[in-house]
Amino acid sequence: MKNKFAVILFLVLIVVAGGHFSCAEPNFTYSTPKDYVFKPSLDEDSSGERILFIVDFSNSMNERLGHRTKLDIALSTMKEILQMIPAHTAVGLRVYGHKTGFTPKQSCTASDLVSPVQKNNAVNIYTRLNSINAVGWTPITYALKQAAYFDFPDTTGKKRIILISDGGENCDESPCDFIIELMKYREDIRIDVIALAIGDEDANNQLKCVALVTSGKFYNANTAAELKNSLQDSLNLQKEVQGVIIDTNK
């Protein structure tokens, strides 16, 4: 009887304790980089590279390069390139400088993901490109931050950004400094940069840094043909015209 009573008392104690009678679970601590956003993996194959175009729609894209505006050259070239990208490749589009604000802060946060990274997306990207006006500033760093933290559909697999800009950062930030910090904990992003007729040395150096630090490529494109070739090389598509490619490893 004593043994039976002891067993019953033991079970009652377990119930009253709410399970705390068992060994305590170990405590784990972890930390994540500032502003980093976790997104769960999707069911689709995560081994393929995701590609995000970031295109400059600042007011200076309305300037002429030869007989056409830089914006017209960029749009017509993108139309050709998008038709060459396989449908199974996940691509997306972010733009900046497409709107102005009443304050510098508003102008320096003028960047939007207008077409999320996904497969079979070429037509939608081109449609969005042709619906946007070039009117604002050049918040490159803000655009890169948004792209790195929010624009890719999951946290696995390789991610590539192709940045097309006709000028350097004109907000109070440094794309080079941001990328150096980002690469301390992110090794999954590569950035190719195409400088569209940029004559300013400091601006070029900032953009070269972005490519170099991420093991990407930097291109100088001063004509429509060179822009097309730069995009083809970046995307590993068949090249037709030899452009000017800068080796960032020198």
Could you tell me what each predicted segment is?
Residues 9-18:
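Bacterial N-terminal signal peptides
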Residues 1-9:
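Bacterial N-terminal signal peptides that target proteins for export
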Residues 70-87, 93:
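An active-site-proximal "capping" alpha-helix that borders the catalytic cofactor pocket
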